[in-house]
């Protein structure tokens, strides 16, 4: 069972709704960056996710005979929907986000009793279910609109998501057919696939996805930078603690530094920090106050564990990015981490004797 630290206790004065709103506000720069580089599909995914999540939350509270307004007005389900919506490919079919939200809200949250009682991050539960069940849809990304000869319009985005093709009859794959095939993959996927095909890193970096950006791939670097700025804002506002993102990013940096120094075909540590979901994971997912460690030392251990698992899966696993799996695996370890990192009670030594 989870344990509560010994008194005295202090109240932070921060309401759940206020915390959630600050986090949503901090995500806006990254959402705008994603919208600029990856098109209008982002808006559709967010709208579908938030509306369906609120409706599902309303229905579940009725079935569980819980206060409906109380659960919806804390914005927790809105944040869950927002996190999942920006994590999936912007032009994924509409039913992908519907299934993901259902799994996040039901399997990731209410099965365990609701907010505050779930051991796993709900958004990552939904994401992993989607990634394992629908790998093709979850790994097909449209190239940044700056690389496309005819970027999808708002109407095209609607038709791509709801019918699988634009008004002119082009599918998602056909939109990137005139560009190097690497451009339809994420930078992490492009590098991993290229290395498996015995292509050198220098050759991979000549792809249009990399030539128009100095670091980590066009669009992806900018989105990660926006998440970093939003995360630093949350640390400054004391909405999240500094230990988890700091420990996570240092671990990723050190792990990638060792790989980079001993191999010419490994991207630099800076590349690893600003690619994939690294910054998103460090500041907005791993810092979930419900599913992360609650002790000061435990937060450091938790951050290191997430960073280590992320790198192991990213470098040696079958998936290009291991953020979601790293979070869920680390969530399993939280009770054990908290058990062995509890602060010493005032007036007692480490053995528990006064």
Curated annotation (Swiss-Prot):
Family: Belongs to the NqrB/RnfD family.
Lineage, uppermost ranks: Bacteria, Pseudomonadati, Pseudomonadota, Gammaproteobacteria, Pasteurellales
Gene: rnfD
Signal peptide (residue range): none
EC id: 7.-.-.-
InterPro entries in UniProt: NqrB/RnfD, RnfD_bac
Membrane topology value: Multi-pass membrane protein
Protein name: Ion-translocating oxidoreductase complex subunit D
UniProt-annotated location(s): Cell inner membrane
Pfam family name, one: NQR2_RnfD_RnfE
Transmembrane segments: 19-39, 40-60, 70-89, 94-116, 123-143, 215-235, 242-262, 266-286, 300-320, 321-341
Gene Ontology CC, one term: plasma membrane
Main location group: membrane
BP term (GO), one: transmembrane transport
Role according to the record: Part of a membrane-bound complex that couples electron transfer with translocation of ions across the membrane.
Organism superkingdom: Bacteria
Species of the source: Mannheimia succiniciproducens (strain KCTC 0769BP / MBEL55E)
Cofactor(s) the protein requires to work: FMN
Subunit structure: The complex is composed of six subunits: RnfA, RnfB, RnfC, RnfD, RnfE and RnfG.
HAMAP family: RsxD_RnfD
Keywords, ordered alphabetically: Cell inner membrane, Cell membrane, Electron transport, Flavoprotein, FMN, Membrane, Phosphoprotein, Translocase, Transmembrane, Transmembrane helix, Transport
Modified residues (FMN phosphoryl threonine): 186
């Amino acid at each position: 069972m989870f344990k509560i630290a010994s008194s005295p206790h202090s109240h932070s004065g921060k309401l759940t709704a206020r915390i959630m709103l600050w986090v949503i506000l901090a995500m806006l720069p990254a959402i705008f960056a994603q919208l600029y580089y990856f098109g209008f599909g982002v808006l559709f995914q967010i709208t579908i996710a938030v509306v369906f999540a609120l409706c599902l939350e309303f229905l579940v509270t009725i079935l569980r005979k819980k206060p409906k307004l109380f659960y919806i007005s804390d914005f927790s389900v809105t944040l869950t929907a927002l996190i999942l919506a920006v994590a999936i490919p912007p032009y994924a079919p509409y039913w992908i986000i519907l299934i993901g939200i259902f799994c996040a809200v039901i399997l990731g949250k209410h099965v365990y009793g609701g907010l505050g009682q779930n051991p796993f991050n709900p958004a990552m539960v939904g994401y992993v279910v989607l990634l394992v069940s629908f790998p093709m849809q979850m790994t097909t990304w449209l190239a940044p609109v700056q690389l496309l000869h005819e970027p999808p319009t708002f109407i095209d985005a609607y038709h791509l998501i709801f019918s699988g093709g634009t008004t002119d009859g082009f599918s998602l794959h056909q939109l990137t057919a005139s560009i190097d095939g690497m451009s339809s993959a994420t930078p992490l996927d492009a590098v991993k696939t290229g290395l498996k095909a015995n292509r050198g890193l220098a050759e991979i970096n000549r792809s249009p996805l990399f030539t128009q950006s100095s670091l980590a791939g066009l669009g992806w670097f900018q989105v990660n930078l926006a998440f970093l700025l939003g995360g630093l804002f949350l640390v400054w506002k004391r909405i999240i603690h500094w230990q988890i993102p700091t420990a996570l990013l240092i671990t990723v940096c050190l792990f990638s530094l060792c790989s980079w120094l001993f191999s010419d075909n490994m991207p630099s540590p800076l590349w690893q920090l600003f690619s994939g979901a690294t910054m998103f994971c460090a500041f907005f997912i791993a810092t979930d106050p419900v599913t992360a460690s609650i002790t000061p030392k435990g937060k450091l251990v938790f951050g290191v564990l997430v960073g280590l698992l992320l790198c192991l899966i990213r470098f040696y696993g079958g998936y290009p990015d291991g953020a979601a799996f790293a979070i869920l695996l680390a969530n399993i370890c939280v009770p054990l981490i908290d058990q062995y990192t509890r602060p010493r009670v005032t007036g007692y030594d480490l053995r528990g004797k006064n």
